[in-house]
């Protein structure tokens, strides 16, 4: 990525969105400038780094402080126009020079601790991912030269509070934020980074020994699993709109059973072969309902009423009034068929189940008895 491409906005739905930089870039810049300040023994108010993607960032330094062979500096996180829980917070580095010739990197206040396998870091270590670890150590080494050593501590006073708005606790990263970023640059509304964060949760579940997974669109699905199915939500992973991607990831990781649980407003799209359920990709909810109601022999009057509906909930009222509630079992079976068709070239495809529920947490339908599915999930 060139500097020009970094400055150029990202266009989403007709809007120009500004790029930002990662917590990894902030930590790298803070560590570099702190090391330079110790060596030069004067405050520095601006520092430049080259990100892993090749972009040169020139960043303002905040709270610089020198005390003997130790210096502290902070860089303010700028997530651009991305939805970013860490935007605006200060990422600090404390660098203490020594004669060991080695650079040691630790996480301090507000940096999470790894408590589960699956994130690519040792248990008990600071949640500073591999790429930022490398860039931090390289930047400090460049500053201090080949002979000196340094103790580098990354900390973020707001980290514990900000982390509550992230997926960290679900990933087993407790007590603070993660220092992340493979490119050093934040791309606004990056679908790929979102998908990767969801996939990472799948990896952690698999690493913990789970072989069966429940994929839900969001929090409502997790609540339904807990309250109505009596199943431990440890097996639940959010898939958001990325149904196809998350199924492929679950297959890649070797899960033997995938259970899709959600409201018909999302899941019926899968019955039509739509594996990205965001409305800007495809809708077809009413068309799918009308087609399958027709297959079940529904009268033209019901088909017309459903076809004219704007919401799934409105369509469901008509379906109930006409006594066609059995369509949900039919749709659940169709969803599973579509999933199996998608994975037809997999050597050992997982068992697929689907459960549809209403907004008031009632089971609408499933491909087979829910009790049977729940029992298998508890094995």
Curated annotation (Swiss-Prot):
Q: Which Pfam families match?
A: CbiD
The pathway this protein participates in, as annotated, is: Cofactor biosynthesis; adenosylcobalamin biosynthesis; cob(II)yrinate a,c-diamide from sirohydrochlorin (anaerobic route): step 6/10
Q: Gene3D superfamilies of this UniProt entry? A: CbiD-like
Superkingdom = Bacteria
What is the enzyme's main class?
transferase
Q: Which GO terms describe its molecular function?
A: cobalt-precorrin-5B C1-methyltransferase activity
Q: Which UniProt keywords apply?
A: Cobalamin biosynthesis, Methyltransferase, S-adenosyl-L-methionine, Transferase
Q: What EC number(s) does this enzyme carry?
A: 2.1.1.195
Question: Could you say which protein family the record assigns here?
Answer: Belongs to the CbiD family.
The name of this protein is Cobalt-precorrin-5B C(1)-methyltransferase
């Amino acid at each position: 990525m060139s500097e020009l491409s970094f400055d150029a906005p990202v266009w989403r739905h007709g809007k120009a969105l500004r790029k930002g930089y990662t917590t990894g870039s902030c930590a790298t810049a803070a560590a570099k400038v702190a090391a330079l300040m110790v060596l030069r023994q004067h405050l520095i108010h601006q520092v430049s780094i080259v990100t892993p993607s090749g972009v040169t960032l020139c960043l303002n330094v905040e709270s610089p402080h020198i005390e003997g062979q130790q210096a502290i500096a902070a860089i303010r996180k700028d997530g651009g126009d991305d939805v970013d829980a860490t935007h605006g917070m200060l990422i600090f580095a404390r660098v203490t020079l020594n004669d060991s010739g080695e650079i040691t990197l630790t996480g301090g206040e507000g940096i999470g601790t790894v408590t589960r396998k699956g994130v690519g870091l040792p248990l008990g270590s600071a949640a500073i991912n591999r790429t930022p670890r490398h860039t931090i150590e390289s930047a400090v080494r460049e500053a201090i030269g080949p002979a000196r050593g340094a103790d580098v501590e990354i900390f973020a006073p707001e980290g514990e509070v900000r982390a509550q708005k992230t997926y960290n606790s679900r990933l087993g990263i407790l007590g603070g934020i993660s220092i992340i970023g493979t490119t050093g640059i934040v791309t606004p509304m990056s679908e790929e980074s979102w998908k990767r964060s969801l996939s990472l949760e799948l990896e952690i579940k698999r690493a913990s020994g789970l072989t069966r997974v429940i994929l839900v669109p969001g929090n409502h699905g997790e609540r339904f699993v807990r309250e109505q199915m009596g199943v431990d939500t440890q097996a639940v992973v959010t898939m958001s709109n990325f149904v196809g991607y998350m199924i492929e990831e679950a297959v890649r990781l070797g899960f033997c059973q995938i259970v899709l649980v959600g409201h018909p407003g999302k899941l019926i799209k899968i019955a039509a072969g739509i594996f990205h359920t965001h409305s800007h990709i495809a809708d077809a909810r009413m068309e799918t309902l009308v087609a399958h109601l027709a297959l079940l022999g529904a009268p033209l009057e019901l088909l017309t009423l459903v076809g004219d509906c704007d919401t799934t909930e409105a369509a469901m009222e008509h379906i109930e009034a006409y006594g066609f509630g059995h369509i949900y079992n039919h749709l659940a079976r169709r969803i599973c068929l579509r999933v199996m068709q998608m994975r037809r070239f997999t050597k050992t495809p997982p068992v697929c189940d689907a459960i549809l529920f209403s907004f008031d947490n009632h089971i609408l339908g499933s491909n087979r008895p829910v009790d049977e599915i729940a029992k298998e999930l508890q094995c």
